[in-house]
Amino acid sequence: MQFAALTGGEPLLHKAEATGFFKRLQHHFPDIHARLYTAGDPLDEKTAQQLQQAGLKEIRFSIKIDDPAEKQARILRRIRLAKKYIPTVMVEMPVIPGSGEQMKALLCELDALGVDGINLLEFCFPLANAAAFRERGFTLKYPPYQVYYNYWYAGGLAIAGSETLALELMLFALENALKLGVHYCSLENKHTGQVFQQNHLSPVDKTYYFSPRDAFFKCAKVFGSAITAVEALLAQHHIPVRHSQQHHYIQFHPSAISLLGALPVEVCLSLNVIEHLSETERDVKEVQLQHVTPSTFSLADI
């Protein structure tokens, strides 16, 4: 194991257990990169020393941009303390529309403290307590997804304006030559992480391609009257084909799509997710069909 993280809730509400966790990690995996997520309030010098001795390599603080100035100042003091003991000190926080000037000022403060970097999160409309967000005038980003699916990991939907502000902040950091790293984590990135966890290492037949771009399993499909001509051409090139008698289509590996450029047929790219129904049962669920043009298709683009 190369990486491990402890998050919450607030892990430092249970300091002995938190430091014990990292000690155990260090004992079993001496070279592991161990990370702690915290809001910062419970961190004191003794705890920071204990975390250092337990092998903690990175600490990430959460700062609420709408907190009172005195509370933010307190967290900044905790960050300054952490810099004395923990090799990598980061901040991770959502980008709330309308907070641009406050965020720019915070970036400058963090840079002055020598913080290694900040992870800007796309702000999300929660799947619960939506009324409180509506009251603040937040609206959904449209479209909410590039590919519609039951994304459970992120627990929300992207809020309009958050991504635009995040990119503005990245540009601000560049233009002002800030030394801290600035990373943007979109909701789409979290969705891709979920799909990757569901799909990677899952055995599938040779008609599927695991996309390194978005982690979907992808295959090509041809329907109806086009099947005969396409199947004959694929047979000449020894391309494996799967038949669906029920839905009247064939599917094959996307790398063969470019072979069909001379045929007057319509080809679709099928995007799929593995759903694990139990320890022994799984299902391949198609979540989107995309029309593709064989003459311009490239496997590297998907």
Describe each region flagged by the PLM.
Residues K46, K71, E101, A128-A130, ...:
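Short acidic, gly/pro-rich beta-turn/loop elements at beta-sheet edges
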Residues N199, V204-I302:
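Radical SAM enzyme core and accessory elements
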Residues M1-A4, A128, C185-Y209:
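Conserved mixed alpha/beta catalytic, RNA-binding, or beta-rich assembly cores of soluble enzyme
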Residues A48-I65, L107-L120, L201-K218:
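Structural recognition of alpha->loop->beta junctions
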Residues M1-H14, H28-L43, A54-I75, T88-P97, ...:
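Core AdoMet radical
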Residues T19-P30, Q52, I79-K84, M170-E175:
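Surface-exposed amphipathic alpha-helices with a cationic face
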Residues K15-K23, D44-L51, K71-I75, M103-L106, ...:
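Distinct, well-ordered alpha-helical segments
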Residues R74-G161, L167-G193:
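Conserved C-terminal portion of the radical SAM core fold
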